[in-house]
Design a protein with these regions (language model features):
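Accessory alpha-helical/coil subdomains and C-terminal extensions
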Residues: 1-33
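C-terminal active-site/capping subdomain that shapes the small-molecule cofactor and substrate pocket
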Residues: 31-130
Length: 130
């Protein structure tokens, strides 16, 4: 919600050249929710400053939402499609890398903050540099 009201947000200048890492957490939200928040970023002009967007693979199963394989695949596709559509409304060329195992997915990779990242879109590779 903070992206829509402006509370606790970084200054625009702090976003120049930043790689944005996002994930939907364990809530298993409907696809429109992350899309809505990303539109808030877009309306602020952030996708003109951000260098790339990396999206964690959405968690698609929880004890109270025991989705089968088909339901999980459908949910993840809806999430991916909505994220791309939302970002592309504001920046048609920014690299969007999706379905990485970080955040609240299973399995998950820990990502250290404060380092650098090298993204090669031609080789389709990502390297964390500490």
């Amino acid at each position: 919600m903070e992206s829509t009201v402006g509370k606790y947000l970084p200054k625009d200048d702090d976003l120049d050249g930043v790689v944005l890492f996002i994930e939907t957490a364990e809530d298993i939200p409907e696809a429109w929710i992350p899309a809505y928040l990303l539109r808030g970023f877009g309306e602020r002009g952030w996708f003109d400053k951000i260098k790339s967007v990396i999206v964690g693979r959405p968690k698609a199963w929880e004890f109270d939402k025991p989705n089968n394989a088909e339901q999980k695949a459908k949910y993840r596709k809806e999430q991916r499609d909505e994220i791309v559509t939302s970002i592309r409304q504001y920046n048609s060329t920014i690299p969007i890398i999706q379905n990485l195992d970080f955040g609240h997915s299973d399995p998950q990779i820990l990502l250290p903050s404060g380092g650098s990242i090298k993204i090669n879109t031609q080789e389709k590779s990502i390297k964390l540099v500490m």
